[in-house]
Structures are given as structure tokens and as C-alpha cells.
């Protein structure tokens, strides 16, 4: 049965100032341009203010500055930051199906596993010996958790997550389907053309309140651990190589590749499809915009970019030709400078 939420109930959750009918109810959340009378919506960018006056939404989350752009009949939740308020209410109204409770009959649980209270383990999951699962842990269907791994209270693994041996995952983490944690790092020695594999015997250690998207790979350390600190969020399809260390509060967008032994500071923002060299350090509070190619350490906070923005093919070919010829242009310029001087 669809649950309903009143204006006053939602205001209480986010400490909002209310304007309108406190008894009006909504059932879910929709985009500003599509929301109907039974739906909540929000505005987080001033360029969408033109949509406010004609919005059919049952309730709008707005800032004080947005109010004058709304219809007098609109029911409003007035807050300092509408996007943060939306995030909080989205959690409160979340309709994502809950995992099945209890332990499925087809789950394989080895001897010597320690289970906390209210642990749920889905169909065909495999939990090897020595694993410790904290209270309220949820292991989805077809997951694999290797020997001596520890998973903290309240953490959820969606279906088909693979966690290798000796991994530590903190409390209240969320790991999406297809992710692999603790696979071998890319460690080899070359003996006259023959690759000799170096066993990767380090760990992966993940802090509390970490979220990892689908189909991301986090390799175990060669000797020491690969470390993901508290409150890090990592999107889909990322490659985190062995012995990478990601600091607290950093966000990593989709498709990012981090080479081995890279240290990323706290509260960094790494744009999608960026590639970052290894064996170096990025300081705290660095933003790397999408498709950044980072080959050297970054020692000062700030916003960094690389790459060529999209052009028509004709324009891009001209740009590429100029780039390839820049060394010759530089030599001619220096020759002219010598003549003038």
C-alpha cells in the first residue's frame, strides 16, 4: 500500500518553514517539470525558477529566495538548502524494496563464521570460514565473502558482490552489485620477457559509511593495505589499484582509474573518467574535473582540469594539427626574438 506524507510531517523531518495547507499529502517525489498534486518536488538551480509558478506539485521544497517565484496557492517547504532537504526526504520516503529477512536455505555458511544479530544472507551466497558479520548486515543473493573477512554492523552488499579474503569493511556501508573487493593488484616482475606474478598479500580496509557503486574493483595491497577512509563515495565502474589510499569524505565519479600506491587526500572531488597516475599524492580539497589526466602530484587545493572540450570534427582536427606543430612554432618564435633583440 502506498504511504502518504503530509506537509507538516515532512517539515518536521527537515526543520522547514511551512507555507500552505499543512494537511496536504504526497506519495512520492518527482522532477519539477513533471510533478503532480500527489507528489513532492524541489528546486536546486535558479535557472529552473521559471517552472515554479506553473508547477502542479502537491509540495515544493524551495529556498527563501525562490518563494516569490511560486504561485500563491503552492504548498511550500522553505529551507536553506533545497537539495540537501530533498536528499533527507528522499531517504525518509525511500521505496526501494527491502532485502529478504533471515538466512536463505541455499546459502552456504562455513564453520567458524560469527553472525551478529538480525543478519540476512540471500540465496546462494557463500560465506567462508572465519568471516565476522556484524549486527544487521545484509548479504545479497549470490554474494561471496572470503575467509577471515570482517563486515561491520548495518552494512549491505547487494546481489553478486565478491569480497575476497582478509578484507575489512566498516559499519553502515553500501556496496552495489558486481563490485569486487580484494582482488589481486597488478603486480608482476619481468624476467627477460617473462612475467612473474607477485602474490598480493595485503588487505583492503574500508571505513564506515562508505558507498561503492556497481562493477567497481578495489584491489588488495601488495604488502600493505589498500585503504578507503570513512564517508568516501565511489561511483560505478571505477578501478582502485593496489595500495591506493583515499581520504575521508572524497567523492569519486564513474569510470575513474587510480593507479597503484596513489594517495588521495580528504574531501576531494574526482570527476568521471579521470585517470590518475600512481606512486604520488593529491592533497586535501582538490577537485579534478571530468576526464582529467593527472600525471604529477597536486600539492595545493583547488580545481584542476585537462583535456580538450568537445569540438566539431573539423575544429578538432585543426586544434590537433596546431598542437602537433607547436614545437616548430616555438622554435621559429625564439628565432624571431633573437633577431629582434
Swiss-Prot record:
UniProtKB keywords: Acyltransferase, Lipid A biosynthesis, Lipid biosynthesis, Lipid metabolism, Repeat, Transferase
Domain of life: Bacteria
Record keyword Ion transport present: no
Active site: 242
Classification via CDD domains: LbH_LpxD (cd03352)
GO BP, sorted A to Z: lipid A biosynthetic process
InterPro entries: Hexapep, Hexapep_transf_CS, LpxD, Trimer_LpxA-like_sf, UDP_GlcNAc_AcTrfase_non-rep
Physiological role: Catalyzes the N-acylation of UDP-3-O-acylglucosamine using 3-hydroxyacyl-ACP as the acyl donor. Is involved in the biosynthesis of lipid A, a phosphorylated glycolipid that anchors the lipopolysaccharide to the outer membrane of the cell.
The name this protein goes by in its record: UDP-3-O-acylglucosamine N-acyltransferase
Organism from which the protein derives: Haemophilus influenzae (strain ATCC 51907 / DSM 11121 / KW20 / Rd)
Lineage: Bacteria, Pseudomonadati, Pseudomonadota, Gammaproteobacteria, Pasteurellales
Amino acid at each position: 500500500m502506498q504511504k502518504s506524507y503530509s506537509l507538516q510531517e515532512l517539515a518536521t523531518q527537515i526543520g522547514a518553514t511551512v507555507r500552505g495547507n499543512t494537511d496536504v499529502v504526497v506519495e512520492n517525489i518527482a522532477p519539477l517539470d513533471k510533478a503532480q498534486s500527489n507528489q513532492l518536488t524541489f528546486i536546486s538551480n535558479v535557472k529552473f525558477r521559471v517552472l515554479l509558478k506553473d508547477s502542479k506539485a502537491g509540495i515544493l521544497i524551495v529556498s527563501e529566495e525562490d518563494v516569490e517565484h511560486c504561485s500563491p496557492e503552492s504548498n511550500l517547504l522553505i529551507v536553506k538548502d533545497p537539495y540537501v532537504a530533498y536528499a533527507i526526504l528522499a531517504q525518509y520516503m525511500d521505496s526501494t524494496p527491502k532485502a529478504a529477512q533471515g538466512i536463505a536455505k541455499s546459502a552456504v555458511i562455513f564453520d567458524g563464521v560469527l553472525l551478529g544479530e538480525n543478519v540476512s544472507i540471500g540465496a546462494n551466497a557463500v560465506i567462508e570460514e572465519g568471516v565476522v558479520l556484524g549486527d544487521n548486515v545484509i548479504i545479497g543473493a549470490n554474494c561471496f565473502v572470503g575467509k577471515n573477512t570482517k563486515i561491520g554492523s548495518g552494512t549491505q552488499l547487494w546481489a553478486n558482490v565478491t569480497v575476497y579474503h582478509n578484507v575489512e569493511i566498516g559499519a553502515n556501508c553500501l556496496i552495489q552489485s558486481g563490485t569486487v573487493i580484494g582482488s589481486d593488484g597488478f603486480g608482476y616482475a619481468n624476467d627477460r620477457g617473462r612475467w612473474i606474478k607477485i602474490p598480493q598479500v595485503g588487505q583492503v580496509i574500508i571505513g564506515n559509511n562508505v558507498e561503492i557503486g556497481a562493477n567497481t574493483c578495489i584491489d588488495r595491497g601488495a604488502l600493505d593495505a589498500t585503504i578507503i577512509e570513512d564517508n568516501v563515495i565511489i561511483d560505478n565502474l571505477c578501478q582502485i589499484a593496489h595500495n591506493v589510499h583515499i581520504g575521508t569524505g572524497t567523492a569519486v565519479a564513474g569510470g575513474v582509474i587510480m593507479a597503484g600506491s596513489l594517495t588521495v587526500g580528504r574531501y576531494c572531488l574526482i570527476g568521471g573518467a579521470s585517470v590518475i597516475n600512481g606512486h604520488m599524492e593529491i592533497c586535501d580539497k582538490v577537485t579534478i574535473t571530468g576526464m582529467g589526466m593527472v600525471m604529477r602530484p597536486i600539492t595545493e587545493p583547488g580545481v584542476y582540469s585537462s583535456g580538450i572540450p568537445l569540438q566539431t570534427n573539423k575544429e578538432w582536427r585543426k586544434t590537433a594539427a596546431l598542437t602537433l606543430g607547436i614545437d616548430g612554432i616555438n622554435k621559429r618564435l625564439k628565432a624571431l626574438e633573437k633577431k629582434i633583440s
